[in-house]
Every structure is written in structure tokens, then in C-alpha cells.
């Protein structure tokens, strides 16, 4: 099943991947699994994190991939969108199907003044 995001955009680095806007992630949080792939210090640091995210540091993703719930679409998040694009592409290549990258990461999330936790 593929989630029907209103504003999904082709990812500029991975042709098999779509980006979704921070606003749409916030609006649909309850219907999504949010995975933040930053380091612990970034997750709890200045930019904070979106409510409801699960932290899986990118370097640990290969061994933790099978722990990610697949009953909802999965959106990967990082600081600016680079690491989360890598994570989403890796997840797709390894069997997850309804996978997205959050455009602009937590930098854009903060620029848009969306709520964060620390």
C-alpha cells in the first residue's frame, strides 16, 4: 500500500524515492512511522526532533531495520535530508515498500517554526 501524500516530490538523489514536506508529516503524524536517523546529540540538541519519532542512528540501521513497524508508511528524517534519503533508499532496497524522505530535514522543520521536542 502506498500512502497518498498531497505534496510528494521526486527525491533529487534517489530515483526510487519520494520526498514529503514537513507540514504534511506534521499533519499526518498519527498515520506514519517517523524514524530519525541523526546522532543522539543531534536528536536531543538545538534543532530538537518531531514528536513521535523513533531514533535509529543511520550507522545502526542495517541491524535495526527489521524492528521498524511496517503497518504504516515510514518517513525518514535527519538534519537536512541527506542521511534520511540514504536511509529511505536502503530501507526500500531491503524490503520496506511504503517509504519516504522528509524534505529539508529538521533544518526546514525549524525554519517553518513547526513544534519540536528535545
Name each model feature, range by range.
Residues 1-33, 40-73, 82-118:
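Rhodanese-like catalytic fold shared by cysteine-dependent sulfurtransferases
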Residues 77-78:
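Short, surface-exposed ligand- or partner-binding patches at beta-edge/loop junctions that are enriched
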Amino acid at each position: 500500500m502506498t500512502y497518498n501524500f498531497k505534496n510528494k516530490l521526486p527525491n533529487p538523489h534517489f530515483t526510487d524515492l519520494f520526498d514529503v514536506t514537513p507540514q504534511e508529516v506534521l499533519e499526518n503524524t498519527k498515520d506514519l512511522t517517523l524514524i530519525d536517523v541523526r546522532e543522539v546529540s543531534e536528536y536531543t540538541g538545538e534543532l530538537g526532533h518531531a514528536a513521535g519519532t523513533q531514533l535509529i542512528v543511520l550507522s545502526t540501521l542495517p541491524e535495526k531495520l527489521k524492528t521498524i513497524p511496517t503497518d504504516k508508511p515510514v518517513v525518514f528524517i535527519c538534519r537536512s535530508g541527506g542521511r534520511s534519503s540514504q536511509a529511505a533508499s536502503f530501507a526500500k532496497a531491503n524490503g520496506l515498500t511504503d517509504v519516504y524522505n522528509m524534505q529539508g530535514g529538521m533544518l526546514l522543520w525549524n525554519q517553518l517554526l513547526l513544534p519540536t521536542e528535545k
